């Protein structure tokens, strides 16, 4: 319940005791609003506890400083025996006095009204357990908190790493936010995210204003732009961005041309080469990962096919759309042929690597090779499945390969690294493509395991904070 400006121990010194803190229960107000509530129970006193509530002052007009309201109270036998209110800072008598109950509850009413309006219109899933909706709503509320002005992207929050400006143009921050807001009916927020990203971070040549462009994410971006048009009919917004959208598609066309210029005997002939993971460019020799990862081609197919369908509606050149469709058909055939040719059926389950020509499984490669071209296979497999361009038998084979060769933990795609006996990682946001394919293939039990494991193992319970 503390912040960098106020501590609940100011009201009750015992709230600093480790034993009491370890017995805390956590949640958020109303099940989803970004107000943190913690209950700490006294050992041996089941009817006694401390209740802490903290939320941001939505009436504050500071540009960067976050003003906060705090309530710390002690309860015995169901009755409040002591309570302390604070607005942002400790008392500094006589100029700054303690907050009053009237001030606190007036601010709380304003806070609730603010967030109900901000999340108004968000789709509510029809589920027996309403807490799944709460979890989703809280995710959108948290996104609005993290994004300065509500639309400027941030990959992380608070701490220097990942909140630094060098991550602001991260393609995944755009695609995951844009996608989620579209699917949950938050079209106004999706439009705000779209405008900000293309105006601030997409250059005239189609590349993002960030290091390490990820090839697959260009394709996903095109697909999501087409989805936005289908869901909203907002062609004028996309027409304004037409030159940059065309440039994005051209980035992929240029990579495709390079792949087609390779010898037909090359493993990567006809498959898009390039970085699949942004971090690749930070290594001494980034060319190790300038490779024909299957995910690059899969999401490119998806992007070309989808954007071509709505290109004439946007006033785009019909010849361009026809060319993208032709390229997608050619690439789809090449992708399937390469995958089938690179299945290792001497292993059980059969193994297919994240790129053609691999001799080792991803686990073996990460253990035996100092730097492995199969690094970050979790992204490569998840994106390959997310694109939904594989025949069902190949999609099943890829999922079985990831599961059977140590690429999942509790049903969730692992953040795959060299294995060690003391730990297993679960992957955060990138893994959603894997889950989507489970659902499309009617692998319902595996999908449910994924969803529950992600909720209860990747996210902290109550406060819904997920690891990367």
What is each model feature region?
Residues 1-18, 28-30:
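Beta-strand-rich N-terminal accessory domains
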Residues 78-104, 209-216, 254-329, 362:
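The feature captures the catalytic groove of carbohydrate-active enzymes
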Residues 151-172, 207-211, 229-230, 236-290, ...:
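Active-site lining segments of carbohydrate-active enzymes
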Residues 168-203, 239, 243-246, 250, ...:
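Active-site core of glycosidic bond-cleaving carbohydrate-active enzymes
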Residues 21, 28-167, 235-237, 249-251, ...:
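Acidic/polar, glycine-enriched structural segments that form the non-catalytic walls/loops
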Residues 45, 75-76, 185-189, 200-205, ...:
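Secondary-structure transition/capping motifs at alpha-helix termini
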Residues 152, 193, 197-219:
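Aromatic-lined carbohydrate-binding/catalytic grooves of carbohydrate-active enzymes
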Residues 220-231:
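Hydrophobic/aromatic-rich effector regions of fungal transcription factors
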């Amino acid at each position: 319940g503390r912040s960098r400006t106020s501590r609940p121990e100011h009201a009750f010194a015992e709230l600093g005791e480790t034993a009491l803190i370890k017995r805390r229960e956590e949640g958020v107000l109303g099940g989803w609003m970004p107000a943190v509530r913690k209950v700490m129970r006294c050992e041996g006193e089941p009817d006694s506890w401390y209740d802490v509530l903290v939320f941001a002052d939505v009436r504050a007009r500071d540009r960067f400083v976050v003003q906060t309201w705090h309530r710390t109270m002690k309860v015995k036998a169901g009755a409040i025996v002591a309570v302390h209110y604070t607005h942002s800072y400790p008392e500094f008598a006589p100029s700054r006095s303690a907050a009053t109950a009237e001030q606190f509850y007036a601010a709380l009413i304003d806070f609730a009204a603010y967030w109900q309006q901000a999340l108004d219109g968000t789709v509510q899933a029809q589920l027996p357990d309403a807490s799944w909706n709460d979890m989703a709503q809280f995710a959108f509320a948290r996104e609005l908190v993290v994004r300065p002005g509500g639309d400027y992207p941030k990959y992380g929050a608070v701490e220097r790493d990942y909140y630094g400006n060098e991550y602001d143009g991260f393609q995944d921050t755009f695609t995951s936010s844009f996608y989620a807001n579209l699917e949950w009916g938050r079209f106004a927020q999706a439009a705000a995210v779209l405008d900000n990203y293309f105006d601030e971070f997409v250059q005239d040549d189609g590349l993002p204003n960030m290091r390490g462009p990820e090839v697959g994410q260009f394709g996903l971006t095109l697909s999501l732009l087409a989805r936005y048009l289908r869901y909203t009919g907002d062609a004028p917004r996309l027409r304004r961005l037409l030159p940059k959208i065309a440039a994005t598609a051209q980035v992929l066309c240029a990579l495709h041309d390079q792949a087609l210029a390779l010898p037909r005997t090359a493993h990567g002939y006809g498959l898009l080469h390039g970085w699949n993971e942004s971090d690749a460019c930070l290594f001494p020799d980034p060319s190790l990962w300038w490779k024909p990862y299957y995910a690059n081609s899969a999401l490119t197919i998806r992007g070309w096919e989808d954007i071509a369908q709505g290109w004439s509606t946007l006033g785009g050149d019909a010849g361009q759309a026809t060319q993208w469709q032709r390229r997608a058909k050619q690439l789809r055939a090449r992708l399937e042929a390469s995958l089938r040719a690179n299945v290792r059926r001497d292993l059980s389950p059969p193994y297919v690597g994240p790129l053609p020509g691999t001799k080792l499984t991803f686990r073996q490669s990460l253990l035996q090779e100092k730097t492995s071209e199969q690094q970050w296979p979790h992204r490569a497999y998840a994106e390959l499945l997310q694109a939904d361009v594989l025949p069902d038998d190949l999609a099943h084979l890829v999922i079985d390969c990831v599961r059977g060769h140590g690429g999942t933990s509790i049903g969730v795609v692992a953040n795959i690294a060299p294995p060690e006996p003391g730990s297993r990682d679960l992957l955060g946001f990138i893994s959603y493509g894997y889950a989507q394919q489970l659902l499309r293939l009617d692998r319902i039990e595996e999908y449910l395991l994924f969803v529950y494991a992600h909720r209860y193992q990747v996210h902290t319970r109550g406060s819904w904070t997920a690891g990367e």
